[in-house]
Amino acid sequence: VIGGDECNINEHPFLVLVYY
C-alpha cells in the first residue's frame, strides 16, 4: 500500500501523492 502503486491511485489518490 505504501508504495504508490497504480492500484493505490484508484483507491487512495491522496495517499499516493503523499507517498510518492
From Swiss-Prot:
Signal peptide: none
GO biological process: proteolysis
Enzyme class: hydrolase
Keyword tags: Disulfide bond, Fibrinogenolytic toxin, Fibrinolytic toxin, Hemostasis impairing toxin, Hydrolase, Protease, Secreted, Serine protease, Toxin
Protease listed as a keyword: yes
One annotated Gene Ontology cellular component of this protein: extracellular region
One Gene Ontology MF term: serine-type peptidase activity
Domain Peptidase S1: 1-20
EC nos: 3.4.21.-
Free-text activity regulation comment from the record: Inhibited by PMSF and soybean trypsin inhibitor. Partially inhibited by DTT and cysteine. Not affected by EDTA.
Organs and tissues of expression: Expressed by the venom gland.
Location in or out of the cell: Secreted
Top-level taxon in the UniProt lineage: Eukaryota
Assembly description: Monomer.
Family the UniProt entry places it in: Belongs to the peptidase S1 family. Snake venom subfamily.
Other notes: Negative results: does not show coagulant activity. Does not show activity on gamma-chain of fibrinogen. Does not activate Lys-plasminogen. Does not show hemorrhagic activity. Neither causes rabbit platelet aggregation nor inhibits platelet aggregation induced by ADP and collagen. Its molecular weight is estimated to be 32000.
General function of this protein: Fibrin(ogen)olytic serine protease degrades Bbeta-chain of human fibrinogen (FGB) and shows a lower activity on Aa-chain (FGA). Also degrades fibrin directly. Releases fibrinopeptide B and a small amount of fibrinopeptide A. Has also be shown to catalyze the hydrolysis of some chromogenic substrates such as S2238, S2160, S2302 and S2251.
The protein, known as: Beta-fibrinogenase jerdofibrase
Organism this protein belongs to: Protobothrops jerdonii
